[in-house]
Amino acid sequence: VMKDPDGGVASLKGETINLVELSVSHYLLARALEEQGLSERDVNIVNTSDDDIVAAVSSDDVRNIVTWNPLLTEAAATPGAEIVFDSSQIPGHIKDLTLVNTETLKDNPKLGKALTGAWYEVMAILESNTQKGEDARAFLGQASGTDQKGYEDQLAGMKMFWEPDTAVAFANSDEAFQAMDDVRQFSFKHGLLGEGAPSADFI
């Protein structure tokens, strides 16, 4: 989000940007800058908690922020503020996942089946136009700091794998491979793979 943007992401060179450091917001910024031939070295990053990010963009001192929903919706409503780049422009890079260690899964194959079954049982409820579905969306909206409508607006703006076959197709795609490679490279560069990681190939 930029206030009174003139030139979009390309104009961020030398600018200060507030975000939660080493988060998906940080990663999104890195990808946005890269697309414009820039890097993190070209900007000044100020680590700002998600509790403070909306108040920050409302102040006169802050012109540029990166954040996630539902905070994004609130921040973008600031007079003069405009979304100049979002995760839809790098599809497949920012995902919400449930992961299980490979060896653990090999040793406990029933665990994978149980988790997957539970996941898609919840997905079916979440997608449904039933009272159960409405209750689930209202609960998750409140849990994520918004309400049912706010949560449903978020769902409408996300690519959801409602069916298992679409998730499998994506996981096996070149797009997913490239996205995960970019994520691990970023993670290694910023020390997120741990002190003992010798290279990005650690993951």
Give the residues covered by each predicted segment:
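Bilobed "Venus flytrap"/periplasmic-binding protein-like clamshell domains
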Residues: 1-78
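Residue-level detector of short coil/turn "hinge" positions at structural boundaries
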Residues: 19, 40, 83, 148, ...
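Residue-level detector of family-conserved "landmark" positions at structurally sensitive sites
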Residues: 22, 43, 86, 150-151, ...
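Pocket-lining segment of extracytoplasmic ligand-binding domains
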Residues: 51-147
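Secondary-structure end/capping motifs
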Residues: 106-194
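Intrinsically disordered, low-complexity polar segments
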Residues: 191-203
